[in-house]
From Swiss-Prot:
RNase H type-2 domain boundaries: 87-272
Cofactor(s) needed for function: Mn(2+); Mg(2+)
Protein name: Ribonuclease HII
Classification of source organism: Bacteria, Bacillati, Bacillota, Clostridia, Eubacteriales
Family the entry assigns: Belongs to the RNase HII family.
GO cellular component, one term: ribonuclease H2 complex
Amino acid sequence: MDNLIKDMRENLNSYSFKVVSDLVKELEVNRDNKAQIKELADLLKEDKRKNVSSLGNRLEKNLNNLIKEEERVKNMYLFDKSFGDYKYVAGVDEVGRGPLAGPIVSAAVILDSSDLDDIILYINDSKKLSEHKREELSEIIKEKALSYSISMCDSKEIDEKGIGYCNNEVFIKACEGLSIKPDLVLSDGYLIKNFNGENKHVIKGDTKSACIACASIIAKVYRDNIMKEYNKKYPQYDFEKNVGYGTKTHVDALKEVGPTEIHRMSFLKNIL
């Protein structure tokens, strides 16, 4: 990067717009090269050619977006630390409460919040992320988390015990499955009933808390992959796209073919 800046300082005027543009396209703005990106952006902005100057403005915008993202995520980590002097704070969230088919899945995650220069950028409510971004982040989270655990209840359990019971149960099991016992558990939405530990609930926690957001992401990716596998066995329900939710294609298939073993019969009373 330093060599590129040196080269640009010496030869920018002799480079065509296309050459400069191609060089800029190859650059990835990240936490390790912010100072160099700023220097390069300033250099390009000073160029008398408007199209080259605009590349500098674009590079500066990308840098500012990164800085804003760092600040947003840092605040999520600080939120987790704001509850007191707890060493290990876990976040727990679920996915799959509303679908007509498939399990309800919960994940619990403990992050290392001691180094705010080593945070996981772009974490958020899993529903706000693209499928590709969720999958990418899920791997990063599992690699960097101090501990994580995933739990689920299948459709049979949901029919037998009710979705509310199963929602609470997967929260408990995910927390109990952690290799590190959390000093505090932050749960998305509501308190965990009959939980043997300290617990605080956070409304819309997956947008406020780093550990809840991470739990949301790995739970979503895990469940989506389960439903994609079911799609191979039951292709007519389009599980790969709807992951069990009641889309028109899914409901039409239910009416034409009937339910499968993974459908929640207690959810189908108003459909069949």
